[in-house]
Regions:
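DEDD superfamily 3′-5′ metal-dependent exonuclease/proofreading module
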Residues: 1-666
Length: 666
């Protein structure tokens, strides 16, 4: 049973640092919390669990034989075991437990050498060469201009990590006033290469059979540090940074006053409201109309005199405008002065300017105008593209612990693509690729994609946003560092990348835009089309239902079982209906990606269902790499991955079909 004592822990401290009001909502069963599983899924997708486990080998050559881990969830037993280990003059401990007043923390790693205690916070976050020179100068920046010129501030990217380790150091110092305390981060070192294949395979994830919410790592018996080769992690001392943070004021409190205030609020279950600012719009304590739970987000707005309901149009729906409007005291779209967005040009060479798109959204929202807008350039721009039209989508992963030898942390792995072609009235699911085996997939991925165009690239290739172009550039860099002996078709693969992509910043000068460089359909949407139905989002998950809402022709077409037939071929569907009476969004027509999977398997991956924009595929890929998976379960996951990726490229086809439909009406 979960302990009900209300200690201010590391995670609760982070919530209080984000917003004091959150301390009332967190762990409160009456309130919805969309982050309940997010931290686990993020750690799974990035390999965070494996980083935490392999980091133990930085403080012990044999952490399992040495029994350094405090595994119990029981507060009192964890404290007892920690204190017992600390009786030794020299010892390493993982998940060491400490309690001071109403604070309770578990230190990821701790080393005791006589009267010196070294504490380590382990994060699956990268550290690279540019960060190397002086960590303090990297973590603590200086304002160069403006009213604050010369003042120091904490690098926003590292803010919560650094406050976390400072919080831990404060408690350890209080408990051990006569000891020297050294505080450190352990991070994924992008300057190091792995020296073995399958480093991640040493540490598999399974569910704790005695706990519904705890996951545990399983590992080979007798594994030692020497078995792991080069460990791509780095220790970073942050004592100077912690000193700086402890001297900073937080909401007119000193550091010590603030953490004690948070502890008081949480212990006594007191809700202390704060003023609404732009951060509130990303609050996890929201609900949708179907939820029976309370919305902390709505209650905070109500406390500030603002009532939110399903019809409320909030400023965060206006593209790239949230902070600017909230700083003016505007929280609803009808409070915005649309004339503020008319001060710059309506158009640019691609179509709508950002200002005009924002203006359109504000005006349409105020007037309850549900009609979509099509820019006059639509006909000219769409008509210029050479036929046939190709649509590709990549699914990729980048993890802290590389799966393969001679790879850096967080190198991209391209494990899946889908490819549709639209040629006249004919739509075909032309190709796909999926590799979930524990091998480096990038070159076989690229070969397969190249073979899709074996007769040459005729027509126009479309992607949705920058991802596909970025990945091809990263594979280009990987290939440049290979020899033709190891990759015999290296030069052909490089030429193919240059043919269909544009160089990114790191490859500027390597080539000019390829003769068949992919066209970004996302940019066309942003510049040429606006639908109130998308609620300000340009994600393909919102644009697809928007164009279907706008097109009776497409609704009629895809309400029939024509997908996966002779009319429209498919590799993963048969006689499929994309739209039906209950669900007018193709993404909702598919069952949740892991619905069919037995929940008695190592991880309850039914929780993946809320992931989108590639998150589900990336997490599924990580699951297949990081867990013991039965063949029949693997096949089910792979089938679901293939269907979802196919839908992404079919979504692009439908969006483009709508553009073609519109230009024929002009």
């Amino acid at each position: 049973m979960k302990d009900s004592r209300r200690y201010l822990t590391k995670s609760r401290f982070k919530e209080g640092l984000e917003c004091r009001t959150k301390l009332f909502y967190c762990n409160n069963p009456e309130y919805n919390d969309s982050n309940n599983e997010d931290s686990f899924l993020e750690a799974l997708a990035e390999g965070g669990f494996q980083v935490g486990e392999i980091a133990k080998f930085l403080v012990s050559d044999d952490p399992y034989k040495d029994d350094i881990s405090i595994d119990t969830l029981d507060y009192d037993l964890a404290l007892l075991k920690t204190n017992k280990k600390l009786e030794k003059d020299k010892v390493s401990i993982a998940e060491a437990a400490f309690k001071y007043n109403n604070f309770f923390i578990r230190v990821d790693l701790l080393e005791k050498h006589g009267k010196t205690l070294k504490i380590y916070e382990v994060k699956a976050k990268s550290w690279g060469e540019s960060d190397e020179t002086n960590p303090y100068e990297y973590f603590i920046k200086t304002y160069k201009v403006g009213e604050k010129k010369g003042q120091r501030y904490i690098n926003k990217e590292w803010f919560y990590y650094l406050y976390d380790i400072t919080f831990q150091r404060y408690i350890i110092k209080k408990l051990f006033p006569d000891y020297k305390i050294e505080s450190n981060l352990i991070l994924a070192d992008k300057t190091k290469l792995t020296s073995i294949d399958g480093l991640n395979q040493f540490f598999k994830i399974q569910r704790d059979p005695y706990s519904s919410y705890k996951k545990e790592i399983i590992f080979p018996k007798n594994i030692k540090k020497s078995d792991l080769g080069t460990i791509p992690l780095k220790k970073i001392n942050v004592d100077q940074t912690c000193d700086f943070i402890e001297k900073q004021m937080i909401n007119n409190y000193s550091f010590e006053e603030y953490i004690n205030h948070l502890s008081y609020l949480y212990k006594n279950n007191i809700r202390e409201f704060q003023d609404i600012d732009q951060r509130c719009f990303s609050c996890q304590y929201k609900t949708d109309s179907n939820s029976k739970l309370k919305s902390g987000f709505s209650e905070c707005f109500k406390q500030n005199g603002k009532i939110i309901n399903e019809q409320s149009s909030l400023v965060d729906q206006v593209w790239k405008s949230t902070k600017k409007e909230v700083d003016k005291g505007h929280f609803f779209i009808d409070q915005i002065n649309e004339d503020d967005y008319l001060k710059k040009d309506f158009d640019n060479e691609d179509g709508m300017s950002t200002n005009y798109r924002q203006y359109l959204q504000i005006v349409k929202s105020k007037e309850n105008d549900k009609s979509s807008y099509y820019h006059p350039y639509l006909r000219d721009i769409i008509s210029e593209f050479e036929k046939p039209y190709h649509f590709i989508d990549f699914e990729t992963s980048s993890v802290a612990l590389p799966f393969h030898k001679n790879r850096h942390p967080y190198e991209s792995l391209a494990f899946q693509y889908s490819y549709h072609i639209l040629d006249g009235d004919k739509i075909e699911h032309k190709g796909e690729y999926l590799n979930t085996s524990p091998e480096f997939p990038n070159y076989s991925f690229l070969r397969s994609l190249k073979n899709e165009f074996s007769s040459g690239v005729k027509g126009t290739i479309f992607r949705y946003h920058n991802h596909e172009n970025t990945i091809l550039n990263q594979i280009y860099t990987q290939l440049i560092n290979e020899s033709s002996i190891d990759v015999p078709d290296r030069n052909e693969l490089l030429d193919f990348i240059k043919h269909i992509s544009s160089p990114t910043k790191n490859n500027l000068g390597e080539w000019k835009d390829g003769p068949k460089s992919m066209v970004d359909l996302y940019k066309l949407v942003v510049s040429l089309y606006y639908s109130p139905f998308s609620k300000g989002s340009n994600s393909i998950k919102y644009i697809l239902p928007s164009v279907l809402n706008d097109s009776e022709m497409l609704r009629n077409k895809y309400s029939k079982p024509i997908y996966g037939t002779d009319l429209i071929s498919s590799k993963n569907f048969k006689d499929w209906i994309w739209l039906n009476e209950d669900k007018h969004d193709p993404y909702k027509s598919l069952p949740p990606i892991f619905t069919e999977i037995d929940k008695n398997n190592p991880i309850d991956i039914s929780t993946f269902n809320n992931l989108d924009d590639g998150g589900a595929a990336m997490t599924a890929y990580a699951y297949l790499q990081f867990s013991e998976t039965k063949p029949e379960l693997r096949k089910k996951i792979e089938k679901a991955m293939l269907r979802y990726c196919e839908l992404d490229t079919m979504a692009m086809v439908i969006i483009f079909e709508h553009f073609l439909e519109r230009i024929n009406k002009f």
